[in-house]
From Swiss-Prot:
Residues given in the record as substrate binding sites: R96, R106, R134, D225
EC top class named in words: oxidoreductase
Cofactor: Mg(2+); Mn(2+)
Keywords from the UniProt entry: Amino-acid biosynthesis, Branched-chain amino acid biosynthesis, Cytoplasm, Leucine biosynthesis, Magnesium, Manganese, Metal-binding, NAD, Oxidoreductase
Protein name as catalogued: 3-isopropylmalate dehydrogenase
One Pfam family recorded for the sequence: Iso_dh
């Protein structure tokens, strides 16, 4: 198979964290003789500066050719005042939509070395390992009609449309069930079926699919408000959570903080054939850009997810995850996960330490 990667560093801390991750990618590519090749492109603010738009045609062509994309982060205050339709975040929505990256996988995994970094008591989060499967190309973020209009009385009104078809729900539920079969065989589908018809259909469709094709997977349903509470109250009850775009966006960020730092969490966005875009869960953090303080581990772990889900190189993926564990065992910490008695290091040093652990 082709093994072509497109690297999009993006904005803010993107170039720094991607730089560290690229060193790790180079190391595993050599060590495991993976035969991967890659090129660089522009997305978001950097693309606006160079081409006047967040997702230019040249990047689109590169993305279509690639088997996997490694992204840093997009956005920053520099572009907050330009027209909404060409802001950096629009580039991210466009690439997801164009490549049909409908399945977003967000693990919330607590490294034992970082148990004290969580805001919850250690006994509540110890051993935490949740996978949130979020539908990424439908729902209220993409539904039409949408906009801001003026009513007859002169008052402005904002409106959006939350819409899901049966086929969209089925394909994301299928991903969740397939992944659950490799884990704890437990899926919790999150909806608001008591109020929203769109999630009433969601609940019904997920249930029918489970009964027809995945009878060995334990399925439960939870309203989103309760799910948000349960994630804080007793997070270890969850294994795989599947939900729509809006709910998934919110719950995955909440779950991220159970682990102590969003700087530790990778994500994958996949199409139906395993092509994917891999990126850290955190944003572009322009306030710390260029200071060599950002945590590159989420981006490095995104490389591990890429090797696992797109290239099916499990040994190489596991080697990266083990190397991250070794570095944490050595007491190395970036500022966001720093605790008493540990050694504070910068972005570059953390990346180099992971490379050394892979030797």
């Amino acid at each position: 198979m082709s093994k072509q990667i497109l690297i999009l560093a993006g904005d803010g801390i993107g170039p720094e964290i991607v730089g560290a991750a690229e060193q790790v990618l180079t190391k595993v590519n050599e060590k495991f003789e993976l035969g991967l090749t890659w090129e660089h492109g522009l997305l978001g603010g950097s693309a606006i500066d160079a081409h006047g738009e967040p997702y230019p045609a040249v990047t689109s062509e590169q993305a279509k050719k690639a088997d996997a994309i490694l992204l840093g982060a997009v956005g920053g205050p520099k572009w907050d005042t330009i027209e909404r339709s060409i802001r950096p975040e629009r580039g991210l929505l466009k690439i997801r939509s164009e490549l049909n990256l409908f399945a977003n996988l967000r693990p919330a995994l607590l490294y034992p070395q970082l148990a004290d970094a969580s805001s919850l008591k250690p006994e509540i989060v110890a051993g935490l390992d949740i996978l949130i499967v979020r539908e990424l190309t439908g729902g209220i973020y993409f539904g039409q009609p949408r906009g801001i209009r003026e009513l007859e009385n002169g008052e402005k009104q904002g409106y959006n449309t939350d819409v899901y078809s049966e086929s969209e729900i089925k394909r994301i539920a299928k991903v969740a069930f397939e992944l659950a079969a490799l884990r704890g065989s437990k899926v919790c589908s999150v909806d608001k079926a008591n109020v929203l018809e769109v999630t009433e259909l969601w609940k019904q469709t997920v249930t029918e699919l489970q009964q027809a094709q995945y009878p060995n997977i334990q399925l439960s349903h939870m309203y989103v408000d309760n799910a948000a509470m349960q994630l804080v109250r007793a997070p270890k009850q969850f294994d795989v959570i599947v939900t729509g775009n809006l709910f998934g966006d919110i719950l995955s960020d909440e779950a991220a903080m159970l682990t102590g730092s969003i700087g530790m969490l990778p994500s994958a966005s996949l199409d139906e054939n395993g092509k994917g875009m891999y990126e850290p869960c955190h944003g572009s953090a322009p306030d710390i850009a260029g200071q060599n303080v950002a945590n590159p581990l989420a981006t490095i772990l995104s490389v591990a997810m890429m090797l696992r889900y797109t290239f099916r190189e499990e040994a190489a993926a596991k080697a990266i995850e083990d190397a991250v564990g070794q570095v944490l065992d050595q007491g190395l910490r970036t500022a966001d996960i720093m605790s008493e008695g540990m050694q504070r290091v910068g972005t570059v040093e953390m990346g180099q330490a992971v490379v050394a652990a892979l030797a």
